[in-house]
C-alpha cells in the first residue's frame, strides 16, 4: 500500500494521519502528527491463541528523548526503563482499548507507541491513544473500535479540549476521557475540588470531542481498512457446561452467598475441587484431557460470575450481605507508628492501608527529566501491594504498572489540598502499605494518607476521602454499587473511583469491562459516591479534626526566606565559597531554587535563625532614608568611608560630617569608630552616599543685626 495522508483540524490544531510508508510489516501502523507532536503506532497480533486464562494485551508508550532534542541521562546515554509518566500513559491507552475485544479472545496483541517528536502544546499521549485505536481499526486484528480520547481543562468557567501547557497550568481540572461513539469507557482526572455537576459536564463535553475523532477514524477505516482475520475464541463445550450447571450450580450458589471473604473463598474452592476432581478422574486417559480440564475451570468461573451478578441485579443481595449503597465498617487511627513524621491507619471492612509520612528539604524533591522541561516534583505518593494482603504468595520486586497507577491516583487526589511551597517549604512523601485487601485499596490509601498528613502537622486545606463505585449491568437494567469489594470488582462491569473533600472532587478514575456507560449511570454513581464520601470524612474527622499545629519532634525543621533572583550568586559565592562557609559555620543544609526561594534545614532552630540573619545580611541593600549604625573603615581628605553592613560601604563626604565646617576629617573621625549615618543618595552604579549631620539638629541661623538709619 502506498503512502496515504488524511487530515482534519481538531481543537485548533492540525491532526494528520499517514499510513503505508513506515512499519508496513505490522498488522496495522500509522504515523499521527498533532501540532508538532509525532507518534508512530504499530499494532501486531500473534497467529495462535495463547494458553493463558486472560487476554494478553500489551500497550507501550515509548518516550524517545531525541523527540524533545535532549540527551538521555545516565552513564549509557540511552533510554532505559519507562518513566512513571510513560507507564501511566501506557495504562491510559490500554484501559479504553481492552474492553473492545471479544470475550474469549486470547491471541497476544501488542500496541507500541513511539514518540518521535514532542510538542508540549499538542498532546502526544492523546495522539498515541488516537493512533492505537486507528492502527488496530485499519488492521486485520479483530478490534471492535474505534475509540478515542481527549484531555479537558476548565479555565475561568470554560472547558478547553486538549489544552496547551499554559492553559493546563491555569486549569482547575486535568481530565482525560475516552470512549466509543456511543459512550464513555475510561476516565482519569485530577481536580481542584470541583462539584459533581461540573465534573459531569466536563465528561460530556469531552465525549462530544471524542465523537469527532471517532468519525475521522471511521472515514479512514472505510478508505483503507483491512478485512478482519478469523481467530479462534476461547469457548467451552456447551454439553459439558450444561452438565456441570445441572449437577453443581446449587452448591456453588450457596458457597457464593457466604458473607465473610475467607470463608466464602474456602466454600467456593471446596465446590470447585469436587467438580475438578470428578472430571480429572473421568477423563484422565482422554486424548483431549487438557482442553476438557481447561473448559471445566472456565465453566466454574462463568458460573460464579453469573451467580454474583444475578444475586445483585435480581435479588439486590451482595456477596457480603450489604445494601447496594452501604459502606463496609470503617475505622481510622493516627499515630500508629513512633519516630516517623506522621502515620495513619485506615480500615474499610477487609481492606486496610497504612500511610506513612516523611518530610524533607526541597533538595530531596524528585527531579523529573523527561520530554517536558526538567522540573522538581515536591509531592510523592507511593503505593505498595504485597501479596500477603490477600493471603497469597507472589512476586516481590519493583513496583509494577498497577502499583504505579494506584500511587498516581492517590497523588492526584491529595496534592490538590496541600499547602503552597511558600507556606510549607517541605518535600512530602507518603507511602501507602496495603496490609489487607478485599477491593478498593487505592481509596483506602487516600484516606490513610489524609490521616498521616494531618497527624504529621501538614496544614492541608481539607481532608480527602475516596470511595470505589461499581456497576452490574445486563444491557437493560443496571445496579450501581457503593464501596465495591474484590468479588464485585472482578465480576462487575465498572470500577469508578471518586476522591474529594466536602467542597468537591479532587480525583476520578474509571475503568469498565463493557463498551461504555451512559450519562445517567455516571450521574447516579457520582451522587452515590458523594454521599459515601461524606460518611467516610465523618470517620476521619473522628480520628483527627484538623492538622496538628506542630510537626512531629522527629521531623526536620525547615524555614524559608525569599531573596531577589539577582542575589542568588551573592549567597552562593564564587565556586560556592560563600554558601559553603555559611554551612560550615552554622551546620545547616541550604537549598536555593532558581526563583530565589532559600530553604534552610536543621534540627537546631537557633542554627536556622543564625543562618537567616547571615543570608539577610548578605542580600541586604542600602536604602535612601534609612539609618545605619556604621563603622569607619577608611579616611580620605574629601571624607570618610563607613561600612553599613557586610560588604556595603558608603561615603560620608566632608561636608556631611557636621553642620559646621570640618577642616580635616582625621581631626573628627578615626578608623574603627562607630557612628550613626543616614543614606541620602544611591547613584545608578550603586554607590552610596551617607550623612552624619542629617541625624544632628540643625543649628539656628544667626540673626543679622539691623542697620541703623
Swiss-Prot record:
Residue span, S1 motif domain: 625-693
Cofactor names: Mg(2+)
Residues given in the record as Mg(2+) binding sites: 489, 495
Database matches in PROSITE patterns: KH_TYPE_1, S1
Superkingdom of this protein's organism: Bacteria
GO terms for MF: 3'-5'-RNA exonuclease activity; magnesium ion binding; polyribonucleotide nucleotidyltransferase activity; RNA binding
Catalytic activity entry: RNA(n+1) + phosphate = RNA(n) + a ribonucleoside 5'-diphosphate
Enzyme class: transferase
A single Gene Ontology CC term: cytosol
EC numbers on record: 2.7.7.8
Principal localisation: cytoplasm
Bilayer-spanning residue ranges: none
InterPro entries referenced in this protein's UniProt entry, alphabetically: ExoRNase_PH_dom1, ExoRNase_PH_dom2, ExoRNase_PH_dom2_sf, KH_dom, KH_dom_type_1, KH_dom_type_1_sf, NA-bd_OB-fold, PNPase
Keyword set, alphabetical order: Cytoplasm, Magnesium, Metal-binding, Nucleotidyltransferase, RNA-binding, Transferase
Cellular compartments annotated: Cytoplasm
Domain KH: 556-615
GO biological process: mRNA catabolic process; RNA processing
Transport among keywords: no
Stated role: Involved in mRNA degradation. Catalyzes the phosphorolysis of single-stranded polyribonucleotides processively in the 3'- to 5'-direction.
Family from the record: Belongs to the polyribonucleotide nucleotidyltransferase family.
Name of the featured protein: Polyribonucleotide nucleotidyltransferase
Organism (species): Streptococcus agalactiae serotype V (strain ATCC BAA-611 / 2603 V/R)
Protein's gene: pnp
Amino acid at each position: 500500500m502506498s503512502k496515504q495522508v488524511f487530515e482534519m483540524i481538531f481543537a485548533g490544531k492540525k491532526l494528520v494521519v499517514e499510513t503505508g510508508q513506515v512499519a508496513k510489516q505490522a498488522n496495522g501502523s500509522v504515523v499521527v502528527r498533532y501540532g508538532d507532536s509525532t507518534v508512530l503506532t504499530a499494532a501486531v497480533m500473534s497467529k495462535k491463541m495463547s494458553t493463558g486464562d486472560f487476554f494478553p494485551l500489551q500497550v507501550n508508550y515509548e518516550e524517545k528523548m531525541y523527540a524533545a532534542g535532549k540527551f538521555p541521562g545516565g552513564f549509557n546515554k540511552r533510554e532505559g526503563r519507562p518513566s512513571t509518566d510513560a507507564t501511566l500513559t501506557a495504562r491510559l491507552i490500554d484501559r479504553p482499548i481492552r474492553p473492545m475485544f471479544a470475550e474469549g479472545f486470547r491471541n497476544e496483541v501488542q500496541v507500541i507507541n513511539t514518540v518521535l517528536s514532542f510538542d508540549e502544546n499538542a498532546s502526544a499521549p492523546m495522539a498515541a491513544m488516537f493512533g492505537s485505536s486507528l492502527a488496530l481499526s485499519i488492521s486485520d486484528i479483530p478490534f471492535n473500535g474505534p475509540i478515542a480520547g481527549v484531555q479537558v481543562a476548565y479555565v475561568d468557567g470554560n472547558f478547553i479540549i486538549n489544552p496547551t501547557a499554559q492553559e493546563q497550568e491555569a486549569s482547575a481540572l486535568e481530565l482525560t476521557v475516552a470512549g466509543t461513539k456511543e459512550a464513555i469507557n475510561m476516565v482519569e482526572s485530577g481536580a481542584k475540588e470541583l462539584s459533581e455537576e461540573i465534573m459531569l459536564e466536563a465528561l460530556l463535553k469531552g465525549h462530544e470531542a471524542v465523537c469527532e475523532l471517532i468519525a475521522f477514524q471511521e472515514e479512514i477505516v472505510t478508505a483503507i481498512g483491512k478485512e478482519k482475520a478469523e481467530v479462534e475464541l476461547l469457548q467451552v463445550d456447551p454439553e459439558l457446561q450444561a452438565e456441570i450447571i445441572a449437577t453443581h450450580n446449587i452448591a456453588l450458589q450457596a458457597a457464593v452467598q457466604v458473607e465473610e471473604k475467607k470463608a466464602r473463598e474456602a466454600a467456593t474452592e471446596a465446590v470447585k475441587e469436587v467438580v475438578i476432581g470428578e472430571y480429572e478422574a473421568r477423563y484422565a486417559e482422554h486424548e483431549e484431557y487438557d482442553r476438557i480440564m481447561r473448559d471445566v475451570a472456565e465453566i466454574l468461573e462463568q458460573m460464579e460470575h453469573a451467580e454474583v451478578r444475578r444475586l445483585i441485579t435480581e435479588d439486590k443481595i451482595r456477596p457480603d450481605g450489604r445494601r447496594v449503597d452501604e459502606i463496609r465498617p470503617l475505622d481510622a487511627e493516627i499515630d500508629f507508628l513512633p519516630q516517623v513524621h506522621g502515620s495513619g491507619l485506615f480500615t474499610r471492612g477487609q481492606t486496610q492501608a497504612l500511610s506513612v509520612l516523611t518530610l524533607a528539604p526541597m533538595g530531596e524533591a524528585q527531579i523529573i527529566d523527561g520530554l517536558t522541561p526538567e522540573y522538581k516534583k515536591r509531592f510523592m505518593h507511593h503505593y505498595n501491594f504485597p501479596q500477603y494482603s490477600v493471603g497469597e504468595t507472589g512476586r516481590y520486586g519493583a513496583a509494577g504498572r498497577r502499583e504505579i497507577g494506584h500511587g498516581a491516583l492517590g497523588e492526584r487526589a491529595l496534592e490538590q489540598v496541600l499547602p503552597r511551597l511558600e507556606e510549607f517549604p517541605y518535600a512530602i512523601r507518603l507511602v501507602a502499605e496495603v496490609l489487607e485487601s478485599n477491593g478498593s485499596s487505592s481509596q483506602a490509601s487516600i484516606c490513610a494518607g489524609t490521616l498521616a498528613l494531618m497527624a504529621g502537622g501538614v496544614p492541608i486545606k481539607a481532608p480527602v476521602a475516596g470511595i470505589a463505585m461499581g456497576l452490574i449491568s445486563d444491557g437493560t437494567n443496571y445496579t450501581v454499587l457503593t464501596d465495591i469489594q474484590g468479588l464485585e470488582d472482578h465480576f462487575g462491569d465498572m470500577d469508578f473511583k471518586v476522591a474529594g473533600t466536602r467542597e468537591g472532587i479532587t480525583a476520578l478514575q474509571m475503568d469498565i469491562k463493557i463498551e461504555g456507560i451512559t450519562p445517567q449511570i455516571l450521574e447516579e454513581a457520582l451522587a452515590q459516591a458523594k454521599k459515601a464520601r461524606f460518611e467516610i470524612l465523618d470517620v476521619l474527622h473522628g480520628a483527627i479534626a484538623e492538622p496538628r499545629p506542630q510537626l512531629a519532634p522527629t521531623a526536620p525543621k525547615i524555614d524559608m526566606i525569599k531573596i531577589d533572583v539577582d542575589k542568588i550568586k551573592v549567597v552562593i559565592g564564587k565556586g560556592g565559597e560563600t554558601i559553603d562557609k555559611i554551612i560550615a559555620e552554622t551546620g545547616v543544609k541550604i537549598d536555593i531554587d532558581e526563583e530565589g526561594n532559600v530553604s534552610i534545614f536543621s534540627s537546631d532552630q537557633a542554627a536556622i535563625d543564625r543562618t537567616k540573619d547571615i543570608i539577610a545580611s548578605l542580600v541586604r541593600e542600602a536604602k535612601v532614608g534609612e539609618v545605619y549604625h556604621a563603622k569607619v573603615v577608611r579616611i580620605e581628605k574629601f571624607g570618610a568611608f563607613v561600612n553599613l553592613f557586610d560588604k556595603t560601604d558608603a561615603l560620608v563626604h566632608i561636608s556631611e560630617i557636621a553642620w559646621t565646617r570640618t577642616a580635616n576629617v582625621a581631626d573628627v573621625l578615626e578608623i574603627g569608630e562607630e557612628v550613626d549615618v543616614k543614606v541620602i543618595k544611591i547613584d545608578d552604579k550603586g554607590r552610596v552616599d551617607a550623612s552624619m549631620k542629617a541625624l544632628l539638629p540643625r543649628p539656628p541661623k544667626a540673626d543679622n543685626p539691623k542697620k541703623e538709619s
